[in-house]
Amino acid sequence: MAKRLSRVKIIFFHFVMWAVVAPPFLAAVALLSVSIIAYDILEHPERHQNSRRIWNIIATDLYYVYEAGIWHNQKECVQYDDKLLYKPSHGCHFVNKEFATDLNFSEDGRLTKSSQSASSGPPLFFAGDSETMGWGVNDDETFASLIASRVDVPVLNFGVASYGTVREILRIRMHPRFPEAKCIVIQYSWNDFDENKLFLTQGSLPSPTPERFQGLLSDYGKRRANFSDVVLHTFGLMLDNPLAFFSSVFGWHDFPLEDYDPMYSSEGTPREETEDANAFLTVLAAFSELDDKKLFAMGPSRFVSALAGGTRPGNVFPIWVDYADWYTLDMHPNEKGHREIATQILEQLDRTKEGRHCLARGP
């Protein structure tokens, strides 16, 4: 009996020891392993694929905090505008770790195949933020330019990085050919919501003063992130979001979960995709000049689904686009991604009478 009790005590002792020692040991192993992978992504993004795994999130976070050049914060890339705060300059050389590009603009927006040719007829307008503008690709590689090379109508690309829907509409409305444009493709991003909500709440955007513009021009890319930066950031995410962190480590769920979901506001309160869709439609309704135009809306799948599933005006048509190929660190579509987006947009437009009319392809 005494030997049996002694054996039970030994087993219980080892169980307690493992219960006490194993969790911090496993956490330390996870911290080190994730940090090593994230640092390798940061140093050698070409070795890795873009994903929502925790190591990709960490690498991208630190890339934008320390290393990335921001197009609209570079004085050679933007100029002051008294209505939009900033607009593209005539062009600049824009370089980051994963690309080196030349962006050229005219009064017709980012240069496309048709903006350099004698295309005639009602133009097809593209409005959006950095994805439409073509952050990370050259002029002839944007999806708007690729579409321009495959259709017989003029294609004008008015995308500008970090514009919300409000400024996107203001920009195209000021163009001389806006009255004759019958079709507009508008690309939506989750970060458009703040600008749209502010406009709807206050009735206008903050005054675009020269002082605010000067505040945008910053010195980015001050230093390279080092391994200690990676470890500290990894530890912070593991401490603040243990469930999401380990779910991503073991491949059970992409990171983020709720706490880091793009559908959460800066205050941390949940936001349904229907709020984005409703704000987007309300902004469009505020511009009566759009009433006689066909508006094709593309963006994240949940946003497009909310748009398609709700009540919307008869001139608004959702477009589903699968964003598959992105830069590993930079989180913008790469050259292949733009080719795929162009193909999908054309396929979507060709499926409807309204879309075919915009492409001048008959009934």
Report each predicted region and the residues it spans.
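N-terminal Sec-pathway targeting helices
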Residues: 3-26
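Membrane-interface motif at the C-terminal end of an N-terminal transmembrane signal
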Residues: 25-47
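Membrane/wall-proximal cationic-aromatic binding patches
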Residues: 41-149, 320, 324
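Short hydrophobic segments within beta-strands
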Residues: 127-128, 187, 298
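Conserved SGNH/GDSL esterase-like catalytic core that processes O-acyl groups on lipids
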Residues: 133-209, 332
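Serine-dependent acyl-ester chemistry module
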Residues: 190-308, 315-327
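Histidine-centered active-site loop/cap adjacent to the catalytic His
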Residues: 329-363
